[in-house]
A protein has these predicted regions:
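Hydrophobic helix-and-loop "lid/oligomerization" segment in the mid-to-C-terminal part
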Residues: 2, 10-140, 160-161, 211-438, ...
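Acidic-glycine-rich active-site phosphate/pyrophosphate-binding loop
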Residues: 75, 171-184, 516-521
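Mid-to-C-terminal polyanion-binding domains and interfaces
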Residues: 78-79, 312-316, 322-356, 409-574
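Short alpha-helices
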Residues: 99, 177-216, 221-233
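Generic beta-sheet signal
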Residues: 114, 144, 165-169, 183-185, ...
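Short gly/pro/ser/thr-enriched loop/turn and capping motifs at secondary-structure boundaries
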Residues: 119-121, 150, 170-175, 189-190, ...
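Intrinsically disordered, low-complexity regulatory tails of plant transcription factors
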Residues: 150-151, 235
């Protein structure tokens, strides 16, 4: 599928602000334009962006119900009540449980944690989990990354004498559960200044408020920011505002003095000694933590994150790595089977969304499969399987199509649903499958335009190769951490040429190792184009072509050079 390149064309106002900012901070015009496009237009804003400050974290008591939550927690600790820290089985949930449990452990000898089983209990608060709490004398449950829609289950817990403090970041319904406190910055009555916290981030704010109410030093809480960084990266929330501060300091902790559990994962990922980035969390650390909940039970991930000795951390990391290997095999198998179903669709070109179902598919990987189908076909995808008496599924979307809203418009056919704009989960009775499929496909057909089904690459700026040097890279690195709403900048260079030494590499010669030259400046630079072997014949013979790319540092044998990570090549027009 051919990519469409979208160039950001700066306005006259943006160019004026760029020039003013460049004069104030002494950075290159390109970097200053990138900052302006991200809403940073003054030297003071640039300073805060480049060097986030923990003092700029918002007052946690601005969040609705925070005072109630802290008061109830303090009472529970004072009365030595049994407290259960309850969280979802994904990375966000398990890191949130680990953070809250770690922080409260010194203040309670009756603290426990619980992760629901994906297959036996499903997502979120479960009756089984509440019964576990009741049977063990728990009188307060702190739920993390779940609970915002669990109205009936919270009522069930109240009947058993169990209070709930809900810490969630998903979209609430019009009616909130009748909990002691519902902490969610997305509440319609919220005046909290930042609504994009992860579930772990909400848990952190709760602990920040608890610490503040007791005049505890912030230093112990700061050590746990590594967990918020892992959750922010893995849950794909915007890395802006407060999340940028949390991610920035979390990465510092992860790189300088990680906990034993995360150190175990870092070692088994081959990241030891490397400067760990958001991308490393997204593609290496996060999937391994997630694999526990996908293949077995997410409690094992929490056990690892709470590990107290090196040997235990190493052993648990190896177990989780094994789960991840099994997950990869299963993921490939089910993706192949889903593609085979799609190949049988008579009118695939006309379809604006995909719904596939197989009762035998593994529930733990269907979210990954949905992502792969969306990437391949560039259409919203819903992947469904059978779980107990219900059909359950995961949905992923393309830019501009709110899949949560589409699924919400099918709510009368569903037993449960939840999620975000681009990712959601759902469950339904088998007799409603056909009606759901028809309605969802019609909603997509009515709303999605052809441009949304074309993969797009947003290009931040056009660069001459001569502009790419160590000074430029140093300025670019100051924009870390990159992620949603502060993506790693994508650049374009026009009319570059192969120096004559480019070659195919990889086990199946599927990648191109490039050596590029710019005739105008005689600048040479290396690049790698993964999976673009089909372009190799078009770029030979000093023919000019256009590339878009990100810039990386490549260290080999102690020598660091700059390298272009090529995202696309166009030989003719763009």
């Amino acid at each position: 599928m051919t990519n469409k390149w979208n160039f950001q064309t700066p306005t006259e106002e943006e160019l004026r602000k760029r020039d003013t900012l460049a004069a104030e901070i002494g950075f290159s015009p390109i970097i200053c334009l990138l900052l302006v496009q991200r809403g940073i237009t003054t030297a003071e804003e640039a300073r805060k962006f480049f060097k986030p400050n923990l003092n700029d974290l918002h007052d946690p008591f601005l969040m609705p119900d925070m005072e109630k939550a802290v008061k109830r927690l303090n009472r529970a600790l004072g009365n030595k009540e049994k407290i259960l820290v309850y969280g979802d089985y994904d990375v966000d949930g398990t890191t949130a449980v680990s953070l809250v449990f770690k922080y409260l452990r010194p203040y309670s000898s009756t603290l426990d944690y619980y992760i629901p089983d994906r297959y036996d209990e499903g997502y979120g608060i479960s009756y089984k989990g509440i019964n576990y709490a009741y049977e063990n004398g728990v009188t307060l449950i702190i739920s993390l990354d779940c609970g915002i829609k669990a109205i009936e289950k919270i009522e069930y817990a109240k009947e058993k004498g169990i209070d709930f403090i809900i810490c969630d970041h998903h979209m609430p319904d019009d009616t909130l559960p009748d909990a002691v406190a519902v902490l969610d910055a997305k509440r319609v009555d919220s005046i909290y200044p930042y609504e994009h916290l992860s579930g772990c981030g909400v848990g952190f704010k709760f602990m920040q408020a608890f610490a503040k109410s007791n005049n505890f030093p912030f230093s112990e809480l700061e050590k746990l920011l590594e967990l918020t960084a892992v959750s922010i990266a893995s849950d794909i929330v915007p890395i802006t505002g407060e999340n940028r501060i949390l991610a920035y300091y979390g990465l510092k902790q992860l790189n300088s003095n990680p906990s034993l559990g995360l150190k175990g994962i870092i070692d088994i990922c081959g990241l030891t000694g490397k400067d760990i980035t958001i991308s490393d969390i997204v593609f290496k650390i996060g999937p391994r933590i997630n694999a526990s909940g996908r293949m077995m039970n997410g409690k094992e991930a929490v056990d690892l994150l709470l590990a107290k000795d090196v040997e235990s951390a190493r052993e648990k990391s190896e177990n989780i790595n094994q789960y991840n290997d099994e997950r990869r095999e299963l993921d490939k198998k089910i993706t192949d089977e889903a593609n085979a179903i799609i190949d049988e669709f008579a009118n695939m070109e006309d379809r604006k969304a995909i719904v596939v179902y197989n009762p035998g598919w593994h529930k733990g990987v269907i979210g990954i499969v949905a992502s792969r189908l969306t990437e391949k076909y560039y259409r919203p995808a819903v992947v469904l399987t059978k779980s107990s008496e219900l059909i359950t599924g995961s949905a992923r979307s393309v830019t501009g199509f709110d899949i949560y809203k589409a699924i919400e418009n099918c709510r009368d056919l569903l037993e449960n649903f939840g999620g975000h704009t681009y990712a959601a989960g759902l469950s339904l009775k088998e007799e409603n499958l056909e009606a759901f499929t028809d309605r969802f496909l019609k909603l997509a057909a009515d709303e999605i335009i052809p441009e949304q089904m074309t993969p797009q690459i947003d290009i931040d700026a056009v660069l001459d190769l001569k502009e790419i040097n160590t000074k430029f890279m140093g300025e670019l690195k100051r924009m870390n951490p990159f992620g949603p709403d502060n993506q790693k900048p994508v650049f374009c260079s026009l009319n570059v040429k192969d120096y004559g030494t480019s070659k195919l590499v990889g086990k199946e010669l599927e990648h191109i190792k490039l050596e590029l030259i710019d005739d105008k400046s005689n600048t040479r630079i290396h690049g790698i184009a993964f999976g673009m072997h089909e372009h190799s014949k078009h770029i030979k013979g000093m023919k000019p072509f256009n590339i878009c790319y990100t810039i990386e540092e490549n260290t080999y044998n102690g020598n660091t050079t700059l390298q272009l990570m090529v995202k696309d090549i166009k030989v003719d027009d763009i």
